[in-house]
Amino acid sequence: NRTYKVKAETGQSYTTPLVVMKEGKEVIITFGSDHLTAHTAEDGKLLWDCGGYNPGDKAMWRVIASPSISKDIVVVPYGRKGYFAAVKAEGEGDITKTNRLWTKDVGADVPSPIAHGDKAYLITDRGHIYCFDLESGDQIWDQKLPRSSASYYSSPIISGQRMVLAREDGVVMVMKLLEGGFELLSENKMNERLIASPIPIDNRLYLRGQKHLFCLGG
């Protein structure tokens, strides 16, 4: 049974919410196209609201890429490849003017970014990877993956200093993250269309293809 109901902002949001712990309680952070909001998991109470993600106030302003969080900073891609922003996830009420840390004129429509440690990584649909300082927003590096006619729809994952990213045409790439870029370690052909994001569980990597579920590892 549904425990509570919170008013939906829009029907044009396809993002996945974040679940974090704050003072021993679960908090749900969700991106609803125009606003980033935080709610208590227990009763849905609105804790804070950060707006400004629909600059032109358009009626049909859908979002697909999900937010990511590290060190209480949420990174948000929005504007259909237009923008990438960071917000300090704390406070009460409207935190739009007080907690927005930075905004960049680069974004991703489908792949979700990763906030990892003190860095934020953004991957565009065409395989251009950007690395930013999480707190200041300073760009540390950017580098392109091998050129291909296929796009990137799945979101990357990071384990240690390795990033794993699947391309639409079934090529799974493993990269070593460096201070000034990345080293491409391998390109693995699954021979099947891949759109879903890879999932790591117990030292194994699961990939859902168009026809099969793959499990990699030992």
Enumerate the language-model features and the residues they cover.
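Beta-rich carbohydrate-recognition and catalytic domains
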Residues: 38-43, 47, 78, 84-85, ...
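Residue-level signature of beta-propeller blades and closely related beta-rich strand-turn architectures
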Residues: 23, 32-34, 80, 126, ...
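Extracytoplasmic beta-rich repeat domains
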Residues: 1-25, 49-70, 77-80, 99-114, ...
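Loop/turn-rich, solvent-exposed surfaces of beta-rich toroidal or solenoidal domains
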Residues: 73, 82-84, 105-180
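Residue-level signal for well-ordered, solvent-exposed loop/turn and beta-edge residues enriched
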Residues: 1, 45, 138, 181-183, ...
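Blade-level signature of beta-propeller repeat domains, shared across WD40, Kelch, NHL, RCC1
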Residues: 169-171, 192-218
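Short loop/turn segments immediately following beta-strands, especially the blade-tip
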Residues: 41-44, 84-95, 134-135, 174-181, ...
